[in-house]
Amino acid sequence: MPDYEGNGEDIDNYTGGSSPPPKSRSSHGHGPTPDDYSDSKSQHSSRENEKDRDSSRSREKDRERGRDKDRDRDRDRDRGRDRDRGRDRDKDREREKDRDRHHGDRHRDRSDRREKERTRDRDDDDRHRTRDYDQQREHAKDRESRHRHRSRSRGRSEHRSRSRSRSRSKSKRISGFDMAPPTSAMLPGITAAAGQVPGTNPPIPGMFPNMFPLASGQFGALPVMPIQAMTQQATRHARRVYVGGLPAHANEQSVATFFSHVMSAIGGNTAGPGDAVVNVYINYEKKFAFVEMRSVEEASNAMALDGIIFEGAPCKVRRPSDYNPSLAATLGPSQPNPNLNLAAVGLSPGSAGGLEGPDRIFVGGLPYYFTEAQIRELLESFGPLRGFDLVKDRETGNSKGYAFCVYQDVSVTDIACAALNGIKMGDKTLTVRRANQGTTQPKPEQESVLLHAQQQIALQRLMLQPATLATKVLSLTEVISADELNDDEDYQDILEDMRTECGKFGSLVNVVIPRPSPNGEPTPGVGKVFLEYADVDSSSKARQSLNGRKFGGNQVVAVFYPENKFYEGDYDG
């Protein structure tokens, strides 16, 4: 058997001193050697170390990942905090904005509330004022409807129903009898005689606007005016006379004295003894005057004085520009009395107005509703007139549709005739030529005035014709309405009021106020008050004081009433 103990050296020697590669041991050999254990152990240790290193690296990576996660969490947390802080700041800003907005809204709300309160206060004030105005208007209506409710006893209880309470002072104020009648500046030494129906206050001396304006509705039909307005205008204007061409040194007194003397000299004083002139108003700048006569008839008689010489100056005597012939015709004559003694003052019917001679112009085809002022304005477009005469019906005072005129400059006569002849005026065609041309006189227009004008004149004739003879009985109109006479107590109060107020002018014998019939039948004289005095002097004083006064907002018309009708119970006059 070989000696294995020396194999090692032999082998080393065999290989030439080089160590042979280790031979693997068979498992069914002698078993592992210590070196094998050492190697195995070393390998195992290496593997363990490698594993440890891997574990360390893995743990390091895990820790790094953890740190990264922590950093990410920190960053996320920081970002979240920043976002939260940003959101908080945004919220704070929003809250600030909301607070500012809310403050502004509150301020606006307060302002709106204050404005609403002010508006509400203004509305309340307006409502109060409106209510007060409505109440005042209702009170005024009540006063006008009741007129003169006054207490019959000064000791009557003040808490009585308002509709029945009538204090003495309120009654005086409501009734209007505490107001003086319209007065004018009466000339010294001239007796003021009242006209037939009260007129309006005269203008201030020296102030005369609208001297010759065209009347409203100048090319239309006759205007319709309320009865009271027509009465005032017609009465005053029918009693006034325009006097032009006055000398520079003329004054109211000298004009009044002159025309009163002239009217007396020609027999023109038809209203009785005394001065015919009531008032004179002079425009010194333009040297003309308005002379107011006592009556319509005396004013018409004064028309014959056109061309009269006053203190060396020839004067023009005309109707005022607002003279209404239709209304004036219901109050008295509109033409001068043909029996006037004009020769007493150096005048003659042919010379008055200078409307005689070869240069006199005939103007025909005039519309009936044209006024004197309108026709004069048309003719004076060719030059000033020396004379003008619109021919009128003596009964009605309405225009007959033709006129005569003479120009101051006679050289324009033919020019005016040629220019005006054939012109259309409304539904008429003018015929203008020299009056002495041809052998026949122009045929007057036969057409009547418009039917409406006739009806208006008839109504005026019935309602406004005054009594010319002074009597002991006065008739007052425009004082009360029929509605005020239904209540017995109101009726008694009105009676007492009339006795108290109207008894101040003399011995008042009786007061009669016709009442409406209970069955609704018409009763004559309803709305009038009849006053019977003991003498004419007392009734004249009452008429002078009451005529034209305001009573319950209306202007009272006081006229003399026939005594025989009054005693017979005829109150429909």
From Swiss-Prot:
GO terms for MF: RNA binding
UniProt-listed InterPro entries: Nucleotide-bd_a/b_plait_sf, RBD_domain_sf, RRM_dom, U2AF_lg
Listed Basic residues bias regions: 161-173
Domain annotation RRM: ranges: 239-322, 359-437, 478-564
Entry's Gene Ontology cellular component terms: nucleus
SUPFAM superfamilies, A to Z: RNA-binding domain, RBD
Role: Necessary for the splicing of pre-mRNA. Binds to the U -enriched regions of plant introns.
Protein's recorded name: Splicing factor U2af large subunit B
Species annotation: Nicotiana plumbaginifolia
